Regions:
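Residues in flexible loops and secondary-structure boundaries
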Residues: 21-23, 32, 43, 50, ...
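Feature responds to low-complexity, polar/acidic, surface-exposed segments characteristic
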Residues: 78-96, 104, 109-158, 164-185, ...
Length: 203
């Protein structure tokens, strides 16, 4: 993506995790990339971002592309020692460690560009997929058997697994409505069915 700042088009730097480091590439010619690690806004006196990258740590990384006359664009990333990058999960939030752990366990994938929408709702497809990943069973490579769950979707295999396990049953019209938000009562029913099958009182 790019933004217009005082008539100048600035492209967003490319961020990636590589060998335990945060690598940031600045695609803008005649500009500098400066950063801070204390949460403050980078200035022209801040350190230049090293081409070798920064070691992962738990904290805030703010970086700014400085073009001519001091104009530029600032970006913020939240990092964890476990090697994860977040755009919208502050390290001082009450849920940071839980989301960081869920990502480490491959339960969460995010919505792209290191964003996770922590305040967003959870739909029925997301919940079943997270549950399937948490249980760790092999997932069938087949359609789920619902009229609105087609093959090849990111949640199809998890839906098929949950249906075969009789954890989900869908609606009378044969649909599952995967994009609909899941309610707490629906989550409790699915969890209860799973725990009964596993002979457990908790996951």
């Amino acid at each position: 993506t790019s933004v217009q700042v005082r008539g100048i088009t600035l492209k967003e730097p490319t961020v990636r995790a590589l060998n335990g480091k945060v690598m940031i590439s600045n695609p803008n010619p005649n500009s500098e990339l400066r950063y801070t690690l204390d949460g403050s806004a980078p200035t022209e006196r801040s350190a230049v971002y090293p081409s070798s990258g920064l070691e992962f740590f738990t904290g805030i990384l703010r970086y700014r592309v400085f073009a001519k006359e001091g104009c530029g664009q600032t970006y913020t990333l939240y990092l964890s020692k476990s090697g994860h990058l977040f755009r919208d999960v502050p390290t001082n939030s009450w849920y940071f460690e839980s989301i960081d752990r869920a990502v480490s366990l491959d339960l969460l994938k995010g919505v792209g560009d290191f964003a996770y929408e922590p305040d967003g709702g959870l739909n029925r497809a997301m919940f079943v997929t997270m549950l399937a990943r948490a249980v760790g069973e092999s997932l069938p490579d087949s359609a789920a058997g619902f009229s609105d769950v087609k093959g090849g979707q990111w949640y199809t295999a998890a839906m098929s697994w949950a249906l075969r396990k009789n954890l989900i049953r869908g609606y009378e019209d044969g649909s599952y409505r995967p994009e609909a938000l899941i309610t707490r009562e629906e989550m409790c029913v699915i969890l209860d069915r799973l725990m009964q099958q596993r002979g457990e009182t908790c996951l």
